């Protein structure tokens, strides 16, 4: 079992425990009741543990990126779908994939901004395929940030999974 799977399991366990505690609080009179005060410290501990585990999951999922995996090259507001084509101890090399926008997507515009504002940009969906001629990026692991980064200042973040996005409003 990958470490990320073990972390996901632990997060689900905490969520279920929290749901049970909240159910107990409702049965015992709701928030402000002696039961809620009794459980408050435990709920706080669970929140902090879950937050810590979510961070660890983020780091592990990024660390587990391997050759052949899909990833996303996040620019400031646009994102490019890519594939990992090489991995070393401290770097991954990724290549831009061919992303084809669904013909069903039709941008909806309203007046505003410089000329108009696209109100449904989040509805974009794409199909992906490898592009052996796609642009290549070398990305370095950032221990501090827990992810691979690129760009001269490290401002470009690499995410897990393929996600193309075009910001029509920028």
Task: Locate the predicted segments by residue.
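Mixed-charge, low-complexity intrinsically disordered regions
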Residues: 1-80, 91-170
């Amino acid at each position: 079992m990958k470490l990320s799977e073990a972390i996901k399991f632990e997060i689900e366990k905490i969520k279920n425990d929290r749901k049970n505690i909240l159910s107990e609080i409702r049965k015992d009179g709701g928030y402000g009741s002696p039961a809620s005060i009794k459980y408050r410290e435990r709920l706080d501990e669970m929140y902090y543990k879950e937050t810590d585990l979510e961070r660890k999951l983020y780091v592990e999922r990024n660390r587990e990126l391997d050759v052949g995996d899909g990833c996303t090259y996040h620019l400031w507001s646009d994102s490019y779908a890519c594939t990992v084509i090489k991995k070393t101890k401290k770097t991954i090399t990724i290549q831009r994939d061919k992303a084809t926008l669904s013909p069903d997507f039709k941008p909806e515009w309203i007046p505003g901004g410089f000329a108009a504002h696209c109100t449904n940009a989040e509805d974009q969906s794409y199909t992906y395929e490898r592009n052996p001629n796609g642009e290549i990026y070398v990305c370095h692991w950032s221990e501090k940030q827990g992810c691979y980064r690129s760009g001269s200042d490290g401002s470009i973040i690499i995410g897990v999974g393929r996600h193309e996005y075009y910001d029509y409003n920028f």
